[in-house]
């Protein structure tokens, strides 16, 4: 049974900075509440209260909410309208799909002078003959009933027919109350019968049979007998699950009436199933075998249960291994446990192992683990156990000359790129064409280039009649 608590109200009051005393609106729908309590003491300033889709069977503990304007109690188990006289500012009341059969209980709403909207659709009383006329005549302050506006002519007609309608409503109420009494008695008998069947089924289940077996000669079970026992346990577990499935199927296929008792029974059945499922999952987690990190033969296995990204670098220059494990950035370092062994490394991340076999032996006492503050990665440096002598590459003379003995002076000096001076020379554009030029002295004269003497070809004929070419 879920009850109204201060923690629940504060969680539903986030829009008001989790303040309860000044809260004006709160929604407590679908919380499986069976009672209304503490709200009138903690939230005196409430104007809107949502309590739909719960298991509330009685209207109570709301009379001190003097500023309450809207109360929603749809989809509950309410059978009678009561305890609302103190809600002086109540303007809208929603009792859609409840079990209100006592229609004469609406007389208690005559003191709510501000009531303008009223919803009773989906209740047994809404099927009574003359239901609407009776409500309109009983509550003259109403303007809307079940989402339909009340006209003046309808109000006058309801007031005129009120004596006849009141008698009909009284007869239908008595018939419904007798029916409800029979339903309650039947539900009580069914509940008692199911409890007896449950006790019998519990007694038939295998368990302690009140006898002790202390045979000293049989303290170590036979392997064959042990295998048979495990197989029998698996068979029993499968049979138990099949029985649960059949029981659930039978429950949902069983016809039942829509009553407050059936709603409560369904809710409790679902709660039991949910709890049994949680317990079963916890038991399965407990029964889960531990992860094998080292086999019986002594072989170390690679394990990455957390599925973290990692990289293992062989730093030959420094003769060490560097492991970079991508730990979550916001994970607390106290949840990490690093264990470096000569042949492997194991890291526990929130009790989940990460184990990696190393290519060569390392020195555990000289290893170091560091955590990055920006990325959160775990970097483990593991020096190799066998030291290797390696030759370093000699620096070239040009680099050696440029190395500075005083690093502070080297930082201040500007290094320039050395280039061959000939490569920087600018080409002489004026002397691109190598040709002698003649310059005239004095008055302007026309200079012609001297004709070049060329040898005559063999077929040349000197004809005097042909004039010379100028």
Curated annotation (Swiss-Prot):
Domain LRRCT: 128-146
Domain of life from the UniProt record: Eukaryota
Location in the cell: Cytoplasm; Cell projection, Cilium; Dynein axonemal particle; Cell projection, Cilium, Flagellum
Coiled-coil annotated spans: 177-288
GO CC term, one of those recorded: dynein axonemal particle
Entry's Gene Ontology BP terms: axonemal dynein complex assembly; cerebrospinal fluid circulation; epithelial cilium movement involved in determination of left/right asymmetry; epithelial cilium movement involved in extracellular fluid movement; establishment of localization in cell; flagellated sperm motility; outer dynein arm assembly; protein localization to cilium
Compositionally biased tracts (Basic and acidic residues): 194-213
Main location: cytoplasm
Keyword field: Cell projection, Cilium, Coiled coil, Cytoplasm, Flagellum, Leucine-rich repeat, Repeat
PROSITE patterns in alphabetical order: LRR
Region of interest (Disordered), ranges: 182-265, 447-470
Residue span, CS domain: 303-395
LRR repeat ranges per the UniProt record: 20-43, 44-65, 66-89, 90-110
Function summary: Involved in dynein arm assembly, is important for expression and transporting outer dynein arm (ODA) proteins from the cytoplasm to the cilia.
Family affiliation: Belongs to the tilB family.
Stated name of the protein: Dynein axonemal assembly factor 11
Organism: Xenopus tropicalis (Western clawed frog)
Organism placement in taxonomy: Eukaryota, Metazoa, Chordata, Craniata, Vertebrata
Gene name per UniProt: dnaaf11
